[in-house]
Design a protein with these regions (language model features):
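Residue-level detector of alpha-helix initiation sites
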Residues: 20-22, 81, 127
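ADP-ribose/adenylate-binding Rossmann-like module
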Residues: 72-76, 83-109
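An accessory alpha-helical subdomain
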Residues: 127-194
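Hydrophobic beta-strand scaffold residues
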Residues: 37, 57, 96-97
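Glycine-rich, highly charged phosphate/nucleotide-binding loops
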Residues: 50-68
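Alpha-helix C-terminal capping/helix-to-coil transition sites in glycosyltransferase folds
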Residues: 11, 68-70, 116
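Hydrophobic, well-ordered beta-alpha structural blocks that scaffold small-molecule cofactor pockets
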Residues: 1-43, 48-50
């Protein structure tokens, strides 16, 4: 059973084993969260080369010692046996493992998501139908456009002011509930007066 969780990557080192399209997609997910990644493969999709210093590329076949210094390992090769070997080694070494072609061998899966600043909405079908996750993500991207990054930031700033201004928790909760019903322009007006 998988449990939805947001993972703090700040002090974690990540390696992706594989250099194809799926590995690139996984790499881009981590880069989207400001995390540099090491990628190990005997050959790379040319788009990896365009990523510059955000990615450390190791041009080699998988060897067990490569994963020693990493906390998170993504097995994204096109060889099921290699992916299984990586998963087995990661279990022995207590590394978090995601095997892209096997939910059963994975400690975690990476949900489809919509990210707007600090607003993060994860979508998962438990690996049953990724196309549905993609469809839902597309719908959510239209509802929660790029302006929601500013909206969340402004609500966060107002929340801090409300916490200082209202000592009564019930009253504070009611004010915050009312704020989230307002649009960004209304919030900007309120911010001027607090």
């Amino acid at each position: 059973m998988f449990y939805p969780v947001n993972l703090n990557l700040d002090n974690m080192e990540i390696i992706i084993v594989g250099g194809g399209n799926v590995a690139l997609r996984k790499c881009m997910n981590f880069l989207d969260f400001g995390k540099s990644v090491t990628v190990l493969a005997p050959k790379f999709d040319s788009r990896f080369l365009e990523l510059g210093n955000k990615v450390d590329l190791i041009n080699d076949i998988f060897k067990e010692e490569y994963i020693d210094k990493f906390d998170i390992v993504v097995a994204a090769t096109d060889d099921k046996e290699v992916n299984e070997e990586i998963a087995c080694i990661c279990r022995k070494k207590s590394k978090l493992i995601n095997v892209v072609d096997s939910r059963d061998l994975s400690d975690f899966t990476v949900s489809s998501y919509v990210k707007r600043g600090d607003l993060l909405i994860g979508i998962s079908t438990g690996g049953k139908i990724p196309a549905l996750s993609s469809k839902i993500r597309g719908e959510l991207e239209e509802i929660y456009d790029e302006s929601f990054a500013e909206y969340v930031d402004l609500l966060g700033e107002l929340r801090e002011k409300i916490i200082k201004k209202y000592e009564d928790k019930t009253e504070r909760k009611e004010v915050l509930k009312a704020l989230v019903k307002l649009d960004i322009e209304e919030l900007k007006e309120i911010e001027k007066n607090i």
